[in-house]
C-alpha cells in the first residue's frame, strides 16, 4: 500500500483514559482491505473482546462498510446496524434500534461499538455505548469534516429531543479515533462547508494566525486537497485535545468550544432538525456572536467583516433565518450555560481570543437578534424548547 500523503498521530489525555487520534488516508480502498494500514487493521488493536457492532447509516454503508466489516469478521463476531441518514433521526427511536441489534445478538459487556459515519452516528453510537449495560467500549471512525475536527473527539455523546438539541446524553470517551481524510472525497460540498464552520471556529476562539492560514488555504480545502485538509484536521484536534485535557466535562474552559452554538442551536431547534446543517447554523451564530462582541466594543467593524468574509469563502451562510426576538430569547434562556437566570455567551475579546460572559447589556443582545427577527409578539415555535 502506498505511503499516505498525510499522516499524524495525536493523543487525547483525559481523567477517564487516554486515547489516540490517527489522521491518515486511503484506509478504506479495495486494495487496502488486506493491508496493515487498512481501516480494520487500525481499529482492531482497540477491540478488547470478541464482539463488534458497527453502527453506520444508509449513505455511508455502501461506501465503506465492506472495507471495515470484511477483515474484522476474520477475528471477531460482527453485527451491523444501518440507520437512516440525517439529524432528524438523532433520537431515541434510533438508539432503540441499536439496542435491539445488541440484544438480538446476545452481546454483553465485551462488545465494542464502532461508529462509522458523521457526527450524528458518532453521537448516537457513543451514547448507546455509554448506556448499554451501563457502559461498553466504542471507537470513532468519523467520515465528515465536522466530525473529524470536532464531534468525534472529547466524549460528548447524545441525542436530540423534540424540545431541544442534545438534551439527552453522556460524556463517554472513545477508545480511539480514526480520521481517514479520503472519506471526505465522497462528502457533498454542502457537508464539507458545514465542517469548515467548525474549523473556522477554532481559529476565531484560539488562534488568529490559524485564521490567516485559513484565509489563504480555504480554496485548496474546498478543492479537496487532502494534505491541506489533513493539516487543518490535525490543528483542530490538537486544539480540542488540549481543552478536553483541561476540562473533560465542560465545567470551565471547554465551554469556549460552544462559540456560535447558542445562537446556532436556536436556529436548528426553531427551523427543525436537519433543515439547517449544524455547521451552517453555527456559522450564522458566529456572525451574531461577533456582532454582539462589536456592540460591546471588543471587535471593530472591520474584524466583523473579516469574520463574514472567511465564512463566505467557505460557502457558509452569514445571516440567520427570521426568528421572533422573544422566541430566540426563550430558547437561549434554556441554554446549559445559563447561570442564576442569566444568559451567558461565548463572545470574542479579539480575533483568536474568546470568553464566556454575561457581562453585556441585554438590550445589545436584543439589538443583534432584532436585525433578522420576525416582527411579531409571539411565534408558534416559542415553546419551552431546550438548547444544550
Swiss-Prot record:
- What are its cofactors? Co(2+); Zn(2+); NAD(+)
Sites binding NAD(+) sit at 85-90, 119-123, 143-144, 156, 165, 183-186
A GO molecular function term, named singly, is: 3-dehydroquinate synthase activity
Question: Which Gene3D superfamilies does this chain map to?
Answer: 3.40.50.1970, Dehydroquinate synthase-like - alpha domain
Q: Which GO terms describe its biological process?
A: amino acid biosynthetic process; aromatic amino acid family biosynthetic process; chorismate biosynthetic process
Q: What class of enzyme is it?
A: lyase
Major location, coarse class? Answer: cytoplasm
Q: Return the InterPro entries for the record.
A: Dehydroquinate_synthase (IPR050071), DHQ_synth_AroB (IPR016037), DHQ_synth_fam (IPR030963), DHQS/DOIS_N (IPR030960), DHQS_C (IPR056179)
- Xref: CDD domains: DHQS
The UniProt entry's GO CC annotations, sorted and at most eight, read: cytoplasm
Cite the EC number.
4.2.3.4
Name the NCBIfam families on file. aroB
Q: What does this protein do?
A: Catalyzes the conversion of 3-deoxy-D-arabino-heptulosonate 7-phosphate (DAHP) to dehydroquinate (DHQ).
What is the recorded name of this protein? 3-dehydroquinate synthase
Q: Which organism is it from?
A: Psychrobacter arcticus (strain DSM 17307 / VKM B-2377 / 273-4)
Q: Source taxonomy lineage? A: Bacteria, Pseudomonadati, Pseudomonadota, Gammaproteobacteria, Moraxellales
Amino acid at each position: 500500500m502506498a505511503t499516505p500523503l498525510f499522516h499524524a498521530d495525536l493523543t487525547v489525555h483525559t481523567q477517564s483514559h487516554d486515547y489516540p487520534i490517527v489522521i491518515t488516508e486511503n484506509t478504506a480502498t479495495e486494495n487496502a482491505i488486506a493491508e496493515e494500514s487498512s481501516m480494520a487493521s487500525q481499529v482492531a488493536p482497540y477491540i478488547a473482546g470478541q464482539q463488534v457492532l458497527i453502527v453506520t447509516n444508509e449513505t455511508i454503508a455502501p461506501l465503506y462498510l465492506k472495507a471495515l466489516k470484511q477483515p474484522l469478521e476474520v477475528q471477531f463476531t460482527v453485527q451491523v446496524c444501518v440507520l437512516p441518514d440525517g439529524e432528524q433521526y438523532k433520537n431515541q427511536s434510533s438508539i432503540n434500534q441499536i439496542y435491539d441489534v445488541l440484544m438480538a445478538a446476545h452481546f454483553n459487556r465485551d462488545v465494542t461499538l464502532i461508529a462509522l459515519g458523521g457526527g450524528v452516528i458518532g453521537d448516537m453510537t457513543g451514547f448507546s455505548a455509554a448506556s448499554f449495560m451501563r457502559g461498553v467500549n466504542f471507537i470513532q471512525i468519523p467520515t465528515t469534516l465536522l466530525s473529524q475536527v470536532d464531534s468525534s473527539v472529547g466524549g460528548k455523546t447524545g441525542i436530540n429531543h423534540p424540545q431541544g438539541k442534545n438534551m439527552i446524553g453522556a460524556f463517554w470517551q472513545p477508545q480511539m479515533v480514526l480520521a481517514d481524510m479520503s472519506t471526505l472525497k465522497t462528502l457533498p460540498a454542502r457537508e464539507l462547508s458545514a465542517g469548515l464552520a467548525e474549523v473556522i471556529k477554532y481559529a476565531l476562539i484560539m488562534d488568529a494566525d490559524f485564521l490567516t492560514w485559513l484565509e489563504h488555504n480555504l480554496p485548496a480545502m474546498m478543492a479537496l486537497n487532502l494534505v491541506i485538509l489533513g493539516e487543518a484536521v490535525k490543528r483542530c484536534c490538537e486544539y480540542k485535545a488540549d481543552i478536553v485535557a483541561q476540562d473533560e466535562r465542560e465545567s470551565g474552559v471547554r465551554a469556549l468550544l460552544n462559540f456560535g452554538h447558542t445562537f446556532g442551536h436556536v436556529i436548528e431547534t426553531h427551523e427543525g432538525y436537519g433543515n439547517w446543517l449544524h455547521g451552517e447554523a453555527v456559522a450564522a451564530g458566529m456572525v451574531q456572536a461577533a456582532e454582539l462582541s462589536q456592540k460591546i466594543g471588543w471587535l471593530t467593524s472591520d474584524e466583523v467583516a473579516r469574520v463574514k468574509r472567511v465564512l463566505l469563502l467557505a460557502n457558509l451562510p452569514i445571516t440567520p433565518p427570521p426568528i421572533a426576538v422573544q422566541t430566540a430569547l426563550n430558547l437561549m434562556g434554556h441554554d446549559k450555560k445559563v447561570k442564576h437566570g442569566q444568559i451567558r455567551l461565548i463572545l470574542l475579546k479579539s480575533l483568536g481570543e474568546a470568553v464566556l460572559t454575561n457581562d453585556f447589556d441585554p438590550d445589545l443582545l436584543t439589538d443583534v437578534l432584532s436585525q433578522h427577527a420576525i416582527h411579531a409578539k409571539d411565534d408558534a415555535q416559542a415553546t419551552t424548547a431546550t438548547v444544550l
